[in-house]
Amino acid sequence: MEENSSELDSNNFNVLVDNLAGLSLTDEEVRRILSPRKEGSRQLPSSTSKDEDSEEASHKYDFEIDRDSLKSDSGSPRLHQNATAPTSSTPLQSPDESVNKLNSEDEEGNSSVAPFFLDTTNFDRLNDNITTDDEQLSPVLTANQGFQSQEQYEEDSYNNYDYTSDPSSPNYISSSLDQLPHLDDEDDLQLTPIKEERNYLHSQDAPTTNALSKKISDILIPASAMKDLKDRKNALAKEFEESQPGSSLTLKEQANVIDNLRKEVFGLKLKCYFLYDQLNKFHDQEVQDIMKQNIDLKTLTMELQRAVAGYEKKISGLESRIKPDQSFNLSTPSPAPSNLITLQSRYSQALSELETTKRAFAALRKEKSKKTNYSVGAYNEDRNVLSNMLDNERREKEALLQELESLRVQLSKKVPMPAKNTDERVIETLQRSNELLRMDISMQNEALLLRKQENDRLVKQVEELTVALNSGKMNAIVEAESSKNELWDSMMVSRMKTQEQSIELTRLYKQLQDIEEDYENKLMRMEQQWREDVDQLQEYVEEITQELQDTKEVLSKSSKESDDYEEVVGKLRTEAEREIEKFEKTIRENEESISLFKEEVEKLTDEITQLSERYNDKCHEFDELQKRLQTLEEENNKAKEDSTSKTSNLLEQLKMTEAEVDSLRKENEENKQVIALKESELVKSNDNKLLLNEQIESLNDQLSQLKTEMESVTTSKESLADYLSNLKERHNDELDSLNKKLREFEGILSSNSSLKSEIEERNNQYVTLRENFDSLQNAIMETFDKQVTHCSVNHLVQQIRKLKDENKKDQSGTDKLMKKIYHCEQSLKEKTNSLETLVSEKKELKNLLDAERRSKKAIQLELENLSSQAFRRNLSGSSSPSERSQSRELKLLQASEKRLKEQVEERNSLIKNIVTRFTQLNTGSKPVNTNVEALTTISSMNQAVNMNFRELDKSIQEFKRKCQSMEREFKTELRKLDGVLEARSKRLSQLEERVKLLGAGSTSSIPNSPRASKRVSLDSEDKKLVPASPDKSAVQRGITALKRDAEGMSHIWQLRLREMEFQLKAEQEGRKRDKLGARERLQDLIRQNRSLSRQIKTDKESNSRSPSISSQEHK
């Protein structure tokens, strides 16, 4: 028993020394402690088993130390080193092992969890540097410094936590229970029992910083409190030096005292560590609660900021209203000077109140920025938890102090020892550690007191801010009441304006529908015409290709015949020369046969006469072909004259369009000015209308809605400005394009003049060619004449080459002319399209201007009436209007509200219809959002209008793109057709040339010899008379087909011109009808304005009578 008791005493002594070594810690040591705690939860099972083995070895080593060795070596410092060597090297246990041990113990014993104690192994790492200085930092203070250096994490709050179900509880609970000494019941100096605290254990994924650590880090301890703490520490040190405890105690008594002191120190360590864990560890639900509180605080701050911004915007709006109000007062009859003075005083008061609200909100912002991001409710909960913990600590502290005082009394009664042993040093270190712990507790108490004071101060500041907010609200309400009386009259004006605007919108919508229908009908007609023209052209091209193939075959045959004829003529000439030579020889030889030869010559002369007759027949055929060619040339000249007449008509039309463009420019400039004025008036009327509607409902609603309305007004103004700038840019671009087109038209006119000169030159060239052709005919006649002795073939070949070269030049010139004419036609078509668009835009702008002028006149009349009413009210003095007048005004307001609602609904329906119409036109575009909400506010109305206008612009642009693509395709197809026609014209010219050559090569062949002349003539007649008939028939067919084609094309163009004339006449009639309808609408609006003016006069008379009646009743 004695050996076991000695072993227990030695073990407790070693534990006490180890715990004392952990009291004085530096910042680096605390960080070393925290890092293995985090790393311990991630260790593998192999590492944890090694830690357990090392811990068991250290415990065995501690129990082997005897009590006698303690007595003998009490003064040597090696005892402490040997005792702490094995324990200091043991690492911390992982939380997973501790959880497994606790779960196994709970399942076996079904016992409740023991009080929360520390394991000695968790503090063995701190035994390397044992210091006795009093100024070392305590664990709590060093932990607080560690919190300040760590990163921020999510906010958490305290909540009850069941440590029995937590799987992350540390392993040092069970080990510390096993290693605690067994206390005797008879011992007088027992420590107060440690209460079972709730175990806020730290999970593996728990944060290292939290809300409480942030709050504690923000606390600043004053210098005076630190001085007091140092003074107390010095006083306690002096008392311990003077007392000299343990001089007359035995070893057993000293051991008991040491054990008691060790227990006290261990309990204080546990409490400090427990508080440290409570600061670090929270439950997940508490984290969520703190996050919600933080979000609520942020929303409150955002609402306050928005309120401040709204008040600032309201101030700026009221300041901006000063100028238009002044301009309005200048236009109206000037009121009495007393009213002006009262208005100025009210305005100055409102400005002063607004400045006070600004200052109050600025102060609120500054104070709010200094505050933390935590709500008052969460802060009070944390404060209550900390106060409860501190109360418990104070009670325990008082019990400990009483026990310490009793120990001091007992120690003072006994005789002091002559020399200080190791036990005395241990006692001194324990006493100093107790002092440090007490100082830490006092510091925490003082920090909590300071925190409470700060809470009280913050609560007071919040109350002051609420009072300031209430005062600001009251000032705003007073301002709203003052502005309500001023804006009451403008509400009627805005309502009348909205009525007129709705009427104008209906009229514009009808006009848009008519314009859309006209454009659709025109497009359908153009498409049908285009398709018919394409079909006709395709058929015509096919016929031409077939005829050209036939003519090619005929020409190939004719060319072959002409070559054969030339060869036969050459052979005949050579044979004739040879025969003449032979004949001369024979004459010389045989004079007797001369008579016979004469007979033969006569026969030859007869044959030659026959050949000349045939030649004459061929000449007649050639003349007929020339006549046909002349008829074709006359037809071509007629076509040229028609084209020139068409170009002259187009020039006249262009001049007319130029005059219309100039007038449109002037009207567009006037329209821009009027539109700008109307848009400014509409914005003002909408602002007044919305403000009045909101003020009638409730003043509190005004304060909440003014913010959003002012923002929407600014955005709407910006969007309208952008829209106007875009319109101006588009208009400028259109004007530039028109100028360019006019310049191009001037160039076209100059090109037409040059074309005319070129045509004249070509006619001259044609005359020269005709003369050359006649000369060629004469040369051919001379070659076949009897009187000519030699042939002129070379001369013929040269002339033919010249004719071919000149023909090629003429063809190139005609091609160039056709291209120029084509470009001119394209430019004319583009100009006609642009002019049509300008005419349509001109109509729309005229209608808008007429409507805006009418609305302006009505608004001016209403303003005059309202100004006269206000002037009469001011003259009547401060007397309030009668109940009848008030009831009438209320009825009028209700009726006007109903009208406004109806107008808004009509406007929304009109916008929907317009959008649907544009979507029908743009089949490929995306559908437009037609779900337009009730536009009862400026923001919603402006947003809806802007969105619809943007979508309309997009749809219009897409429609324009489609039209442009259609025009491009149409132009490409026309170019292709023009190319085909040009090729056809070239082929026709070539055919004409070949037909001309056919006349020269259609003569019959000459026989080979004079003796066989009859046979050759008969054979030639049989062979060549047969194919002559199909050649003539083919040529005649080609000429008749050409005539028919020319007549068909001229007929198509005539039909087109007639249709264009009909369209122009229909457009003129439509314009006349539009003018008549506009005049009728103007007359209707004038009648309505007159009726409204009469009603206003009657209302004025009734209002003027009602105050007189009320004054009589008062009298």
From Swiss-Prot:
Biased composition (Polar residues): 72-102, 119-130, 139-151, 1001-1011, 1086-1095, 1104-1115
Gene Ontology BP annotations: astral microtubule nucleation; centromere clustering at the mitotic interphase nuclear envelope; dynein-driven meiotic oscillatory nuclear movement; establishment of mitotic spindle orientation; karyogamy involved in conjugation with cellular fusion; microtubule nucleation by interphase microtubule organizing center; nuclear migration by microtubule mediated pushing forces; spindle pole body-led chromosome movement during mitotic interphase
Molecular functions per Gene Ontology: calmodulin binding
Keyword Phosphoprotein: yes
Skewed-composition ranges (Basic and acidic residues): 28-41, 56-71, 1016-1025, 1067-1084
Knocked-out gene: effects: Abolishes cytoplasmic microtubule (MT) nucleation from SPB and non-SPB sites. Leads to MTs escaping from the nucleus to form fewer and thicker cytoplasmic MT bundles that curve around the cell tip. Curved cell shape. Leads to unclustering of centromeres at the nuclear periphery; normally, the centromeres cluster at the SPB during interphase.
Location of the region described as Required for interaction with mto2 in the Swiss-Prot/TrEMBL record: 523-537
Cross-referenced InterPro entries: Cnn_1N, Mto1-like_Mto2p-bd
Database matches in Pfam families: Cnn_1N, Mto2_bdg
Gene3D superfamilies named in the record: 1.10.287.1490
Ranges annotated as biased composition (Low complexity): 165-176
Coiled-coil ranges from the UniProt annotation: 445-915, 1072-1102
Keyword Signal: no
Modified residues (Phosphoserine): S94, S1005, S1009
Region ranges (Disordered): 25-180, 1001-1037, 1067-1115
Keywords in alphabetical order: Coiled coil, Cytoplasm, Cytoskeleton, Microtubule, Phosphoprotein
GO CC field: equatorial microtubule organizing center; half bridge of mitotic spindle pole body; interphase microtubule organizing center; microtubule; microtubule cytoskeleton; microtubule organizing center; mitotic actomyosin contractile ring, proximal layer; mitotic spindle pole body
Protein location: Cytoplasm, Cytoskeleton, Microtubule organizing center, Spindle pole body; Cytoplasm, Cytoskeleton, Microtubule organizing center
Assembly and interaction partners: Interacts with mto2; the interaction is direct and required for efficient binding to the gamma-tubulin complex. Interacts with gamma tubulin complex subunits alp4, alp6 and gtb1. Interacts with mcp6.
Annotated function: Spindle pole body (SPB) component that acts as the gamma-tubulin complex-binding protein of the SPB outer plaque. Promotes nucleation of all cytoplasmic microtubules by recruiting the gamma-tubulin complex to the spindle pole body (SPB), to the interphase microtubule organizing center (iMTOC), and to the equatorial MTOC (eMTOC) during anaphase.
Protein name (record): Gamma tubulin complex adapter mto1
Species whose genome carries this gene: Schizosaccharomyces pombe (strain 972 / ATCC 24843)
